[in-house]
Amino acid sequence: MRSINMIVVHCSATRADCALTTEDLETIHRRRGFRGIGYHYYIRRDGTVVNTRALELVGAHAKGHNTHSIGICYEGGLDVQGCPADTRTPEQCSALRLLVHQLLKRFRNNVRICGHRDLSPDRNGDGVVEPEEWVKECPCFEVSKAL
């Protein structure tokens, strides 16, 4: 098993009024040149957790951080106008908390939990990645406060 030191939460950047099936997600990732879905888990709007990549395999979800991380993506992240928003359903929130808890229990080491946006470069060098430095807004909520 790989050494894991980070869990990275993502959104699928899907509008709140549109569905993105696991098959759709796989098609998108294959078109980007991946061998399949880059995330290890995908959480549908109804809270269903789909294991989309074996944990033993390196993900393709956070460039420069894939080797020692697990990627979790929730369906959503855009409001009906297509703007970044926390569109997680109560079922997704519960499923995400439970999944992260299970992963922390399994790996038992010092695992950082963060959003994809938190991996943006610290452009002003003050030691904090602030909203104006985010390369993207994904996952559209404050992971450190929600989990």
Name these PLM-found stretches.
Residues 1-8, 12, 45-49, 65-68, ...:
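Basic/polar, cationic surfaces and motifs that engage anionic cell-wall
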Residues 1-57, 66:
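Short, conserved "active-site rim" segments that organize catalytic pockets and cofactor/ligand binding
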